[in-house]
Curated annotation (Swiss-Prot):
Disulfide bonds: none annotated. This is DNA ligase. GO terms for molecular function: ATP binding; DNA binding; DNA ligase (ATP) activity; metal ion binding. The active site is at 251 (n6-amp-lysine intermediate). It comes from Pyrobaculum aerophilum (strain ATCC 51768 / DSM 7523 / JCM 9630 / CIP 104966 / NBRC 100827 / IM2). It catalyses: ATP + (deoxyribonucleotide)n-3'-hydroxyl + 5'-phospho-(deoxyribonucleotide)m = (deoxyribonucleotide)n+m + AMP + diphosphate. Keywords: ATP-binding, Cell cycle, Cell division, DNA damage, DNA recombination, DNA repair, DNA replication, Ligase, Magnesium, Metal-binding, Nucleotide-binding. The gene is lig. CDD domains: Adenylation_DNA_ligase_Arch_LigB (cd07901), OBF_DNA_ligase_I (cd07969).
Length: 584
C-alpha cells in the first residue's frame, strides 16, 4: 500500500467528530492493505512502532526532526523553527516547508517511486534502533530520506509521528472493532485474545492472515491486561455481592506490578504494560531468590518502605525510582518490598481459568518469603464484623484498606467486574474518596493564570461504548507549578475540535485527545444538567458531576485513559452517598 493512502485515512480520522465514522474509515483502510501492512498500519495509528513493553522509542525531539526537514528541503533550521513556533505544530511546519521546496527527487518530476507503508515503517524502526556514537546524525539521515520523497501531507504525518504528536486518539477498542468488522472475526473473541496478548499490531496481522484466535495464549514475557476491581462502601455489601464469603487482602499503596520469570531473567511490567524492570533491580534480585519456578507470571504491589523503620511509605515515594540515571542511589535511599497477591502461570500451567483459592495455594508453593518478597496478608471471612476488624488492622499498618475477592473467581484479564471489590478507608463517608479522571478539554486562564490553562474539563470512561463522558470542570488545587506542568504535558494532545470519543455539553476553549489522567476529590457526587456522565441514569436530562472538585496533586501517569474511573463507578459512588456509613 502506498503511504499516501494511509495519510488520506489519517486526515479523515483527524477531521471527524464521530466515532462510528472513525471505525468505518479504519475498516476501509484495513481492507485495502496486505496482512503484513495491516500490523504496521495499526502500530502507526496508535503512535507506536512496537508494543509498549518492548520500550522502542524513536528518540527524536522537534529540533532533530526539523534538522531532517532542513536537510531534505534546503530550508534553514532557524526558518523552520520560526515556522514551528508560529504554527505550534511540527507537522504543519514540515508540510509548509515541503510544499515550498523544490526537491530534485520529488514525485512531481517522475523520478521517484511513491513511499510505501512498509518502507516508511521499516525506516522509522531503523531510526528508533540507531544508538551510540553518531546516532543523531544517522537518525537525521534516515528521516531526511523519507522527507525528501514525501508529499507535503505525508511529511506532516511523518513529522508528527516521530515527535510523538500524531493526535489521533484512536483507542485500542476502536481498532478491535474495526478489525472485527474488516475480517469478520467475533469481536468478543478478538477482545479476549487482546487481553491475553495485548499487541494490536501482531493481533491485526494474525486475523488478517486468517489464523484462528485460539492460537493466542498466555506467554511469559508478554504482559496480560490486568484484572481490575469495583468498589463498595461497607463490609456487609461486599460479602453480599461476593456470595457470602470473601478472600480479603491488604490493599497496599504502591505500584502494581506484573512480574514475569523466564529462563532469560525477570521482567517487571506496569499496569500500563510498560517495562519498568530498570527501576527495580532490587526486586529482580529478590524475585530470583524467592521464587522456585522456572517460568511464572506473578502479580503484586511494589511498596516503598522507610530504610530505617521498615514502615510502609506512600506511593509517591516510588517516583524517585523512575529516573533512568543513578538508579543505584534511588534503590539505597528508597528501598521496596514486593507483596505478591496472584499467580497466573507456572511452568507451562495456565492458571487464569482456575479459582482464586487454588491460585493462592500455588502461589504459596512457589514463593519462599523473604524480607524483600512477601505474600500479601489475607484472610477468608464470612462475617462483616470480622472484615471490619481486618480492615482497621490493615489501615493501621499503613495500607489503603482491603481488596475483597470471590474465592471461586477466575482471573478475568482486562475486566473490571464484581469478583474483586475495593474497600478503602476513603469510602467511609460521602465523597472523601478520590476519582481518577481524564482531561478532555481546558479553559484559558485569566489574571495570574493568563497564558496557561485556568481550568480543565474532566471525564469518566465507559468501556461499553469506548467513550468519555464529562464529570466536572476543575480549577482548584493547582499550584503555579502544576498549571505550568499541565500546560506542557497536554500540548502534544491538543486538537482543533472535540475528540470523537468525548461526549460533552460544555464547550471547552481547547480540546485534547483523551490521554492524561489526574486524581480529583470533591465534596460529593451530584446531579447536573451540564455533564454527560450517566446522563438520564438517575433522572431524565441530567448527568452526574463532582461538586466542588479539587486536584489532589497526583498525576496518574501509571493509568491509561481506559483505566480511569468508569461511569459505572461514578453511578455507584452516587448511590452509596445515600447509604453513608458514619465514621467511628
Amino acid at each position: 500500500m502506498q503511504f499516501g493512502e494511509l495519510v488520506k485515512a489519517l486526515a479523515a480520522i483527524e477531521a471527524t467528530t464521530q466515532r462510528t465514522t472513525m471505525v468505518k474509515l479504519l475498516v476501509s483502510l484495513f481492507k485495502k492493505a496486505s496482512p503484513e501492512e495491516v500490523g504496521k498500519i495499526v502500530y502507526f495509528i496508535l503512535g507506536d512502532l512496537r508494543p509498549p513493553w518492548e520500550g522502542v522509542e524513536l528518540g527524536v525531539a522537534e529540533k532533530l526532526c526539523l534538522r531532517a526537514v532542513s536537510k531534505a528541503t534546503g530550508a534553514a533550521v532557524s526558518e523552520l523553527e520560526a515556522l514551528y513556533k508560529k504554527t505550534g505544530d511540527v507537522g504543519e511546519a514540515a508540510r509548509r516547508a515541503l510544499a515550498a521546496s523544490k526537491r530534485p527527487g520529488l514525485l512531481a518530476f517522475g523520478s521517484q517511486k511513491p513511499l510505501e507503508v512498509s518502507e516508511v515503517y521499516d525506516t522509522l524502526l531503523k531510526v528508533a534502533r540507531a544508538t551510540g556514537e553518531g546516532a543523531q546524525d544517522m537518525k537525521v539521515a534516515l528521516l531526511s530520506s523519507l522527507f525528501a520523497r514525501a508529499t507535503p501531507e505525508e511529511g506532516k504525518y511523518i513529522a508528527r509521528f516521530v515527535v510523538g504528536k500524531l493526535r489521533l486518539g484512536v483507542a485500542d477498542m476502536t481498532i478491535i472493532e474495526a478489525l472485527s468488522d474488516a475480517y469478520g472475526v467475533n469481536k468478543e473473541a478478538l477482545e479476549k485474545a487482546y487481553h491475553i496478548y495485548p499487541d494490536l499490531g501482531r493481533l491485526a496481522k494474525h486475523v488478517a492472515e486468517g489464523k484462528p484466535l485460539d492460537e493466542i495464549r498466555i506467554t511469559p514475557g508478554v504482559p496480560v491486561l490486568p484484572m481490575l476491581a469495583q468498589r463498595l462502601s461497607s463490609a456487609s455489601e461486599i460479602l453480599a455481592k461476593l456470595g457470602g464469603s470473601a478472600i480479603c487482602e491488604y490493599k497496599y499503596d504502591g505500584e502494581r506490578a506484573q512480574i514475569h520469570l523466564t529462563p532469560g531473567g525477570v521482567k517487571i511490567f506496569s499496569r500500563r504494560l510498560e517495562d519498568i524492570t530498570h527501576a527495580y533491580p532490587d526486586v529482580v534480585k529478590a524475585v530470583k531468590e524467592a521464587v522456585s519456578a522456572k517460568e511464572a507470571i506473578l502479580e503484586g504491589e511494589i511498596v516503598a518502605v522507610d530504610p530505617d523503620t521498615g514502615d510502609m511509605l506512600p506511593f509517591q515515594e516510588l517516583m524517585h525510582r523512575k529516573r533512568k540515571h543513578d538508579v543505584a542511589t534511588a534503590v539505597e535511599l528508597y528501598p521496596t518490598v514486593l507483596y505478591l497477591f496472584d499467580v497466573l502461570y507456572v511452568d507451562g500451567e495456565d492458571l487464569t481459568e482456575e479459582p482464586l483459592i487454588y491460585r493462592r495455594v500455588r502461589l504459596s508453593e512457589i514463593v519462599c518469603e523473604t524480607d524483600k518478597v512477601s505474600i500479601a496478608k489475607w484472610r477468608i471471612f464470612d462475617n462483616a464484623e470480622a472484615v471490619d476488624v481486618f480492615f482497621h488492622e490493615s489501615v493501621s499498618m499503613g495500607t489503603e484498606g482491603l481488596i475483597c475477592k470471590s474465592p471461586s473467581s477466575i482471573y478475568e484479564m482486562g475486566a473490571r467486574g464484581w469478583n474483586w471489590i475495593k474497600y478503602k478507608r476513603d469510602y467511609r463517608s460521602e465523597m472523601i474518596d478520590t476519582v481518577d479522571l481524564v482531561v478532555v478539554g481546558a479553559f484559558h486562564g485569566r489574571g495570574k493564570r493568563a497564558g496557561l490553562y485556568g481550568a480543565f474539563l474532566l471525564a469518566a470512561y465507559d468501556p461499553s461504548t469506548d467513550m468519555f463522558y464529562t464529570v466536572c470542570k476543575v480549577g482548584s488545587g493547582f499550584t503555579d507549578a502544576d498549571l505550568k506542568k499541565m500546560y506542557e504535558i497536554l500540548q502534544p494532545f491538543k486538537i482543533p475540535h472535540r475528540h470523537p470519543r468525548v461526549v460533552s455539553k460544555m464547550e471547552a476553549d481547547v480540546w485534547f485527545v483523551p490521554q492524561v489522567v489526574i486524581e480529583v476529590i470533591g465534596a460529593e457526587i451530584t446531579l447536573s444538567p451540564l455533564h454527560t456522565c450517566c446522563l438520564g441514569a438517575v433522572r431524565p436530562g441530567v448527568g452526574l458531576a463532582v461538586r466542588f472538585p479539587r486536584f489532589t496533586g497526583r498525576y496518574r501517569s501509571d493509568k491509561s485513559p481506559e483505566q480511569a474511573t468508569t461511569v459505572a463507578e461514578m453511578l455507584e459512588l452516587y448511590k452509596r452517598q445515600k447509604k453513608v456509613v458514619q465514621p467511628e
